[in-house]
A protein has these predicted regions:
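Low-complexity or membrane-interfacial segments used for flexible interactions
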Residues: 2-310
Length: 310
């Protein structure tokens, strides 16, 4: 062995040692990353399983409530001296012509009431006659409103060649979006009617419809989601004077906004037939030139362009 090769041996040994140490460090780093990745995968898998279990549990539970219609004004909300004045003081939504006609009962306790504007329904005619519902808490705090949109209803009815298509806009206090509930024009004689709507949830629309039951004795409707699953039901009592409906929604769909839409829709069932006849008659009168159409300012506001210059 030459002197030159003997001098290279320490250098080569040091290089080999450095390479081995670098390899060990790289291997340890890879193992650590692999361990972290496995931990993350396990956490994600555990989270997905928990979400799936929660959804499965929710599908087994049902949220239910009752809507009971009163036949007189002799109730604790309206009966008594100065009751109406005090009610108007509790909420600006409680107008002078507000008539409370039903209560919401959950777990045996009244949690809310339904009212409608009597002056513009019973005491009006033509294009001035329309339905406006209000949902209040038991202490008369406003929760939601449901307005018949005559302009849209007549437009759709004329487009459906006389089949009455009633349209309602629903404003809930917890949401930034309006909900539009509309009767389907695809309605054949003796077949059940459908009312469709959608809710925005996390930027994603969720579509639903209320379909009247084929065997319908008390005003029964089934709530169906966009996958054609039955996720709720409105069951009307047969032997009742005013009207009583037991409503239920499957737990995984029991969103507060959906519950409010169902409460308002159930209250509307009482007026549904007269509302259809009213819209159909208006469409015929406008078509034949018997009346000049006009839209009330409150309804016109609902059609305003949100991007207009204010």
């Amino acid at each position: 062995m030459t002197a030159s090769s003997q001098k290279k041996d320490p250098i080569e040994a040091e290089a080999n040692a450095s390479a081995a140490e670098a390899a060990r460090d790289a291997r340890a780093e890879i193992l650590e990353k692999s361990k972290d990745a496995n931990t993350s995968k396990a956490a994600v898998s555990k989270l997905k399983k928990a979400e799936k279990d929660a959804t499965t549990d929710a599908r087994k539970k049902w949220y239910d409530f009752e809507v009971n219609v009163w036949i007189t004004n002799f109730n604790s909300i309206e009966f008594g001296p100065w009751k109406r004045e005090r009610n108007r003081g509790k909420s600006r939504q409680f107008t002078t012509d507000m008539d409370i006609f039903a209560e919401i009962v959950e777990n045996g306790t009244r949690t809310g009431v339904l009212g409608y504007r009597k002056e513009i329904w019973k005491d009006a005619s033509g294009m001035d006659k329309r339905l406006v519902f209000k949902l209040f808490s038991d202490t008369l705090n406003w929760k939601a409103s449901m307005d018949m949109m005559l302009g849209r209803s007549i437009q759709q009815t004329l487009g459906a060649r006389g089949v009455p298509v009633t349209t309602y806009s629903i404003n809930t206090s917890e949401d930034d979006y309006l909900v539009y509930l509309e009767r389907s024009a695809n309605k054949w004689p003796l077949l059940p009617e459908n009312f469709s709507f959608f809710l925005m949830e996390g930027g994603e629309p969720k579509f639903y419809r209320f379909r009247r039951d084929f065997i319908n004795l008390g005003g029964d409707y089934t709530l169906i989601n966009q996958h054609d699953e039955h996720v709720g039901h409105i069951d009307g009592a047969i032997l009742t004077i005013g009207g009583r409906w037991r409503c239920k929604v499957r737990g995984d769909h029991a969103d507060p906004r959906l519950i409010q839409v169902m409460k308002l829709f159930t209250g509307m069932i009482v007026f549904n037939r007269k509302a259809r006849r009213h819209v159909k008659a208006l469409a015929h009168d406008i078509r034949d030139g018997r009346i000049k159409p006009n839209i009330q300012r409150q309804e016109a506001d609902l059609y305003m362009n949100p991007r207009r210059i204010r």
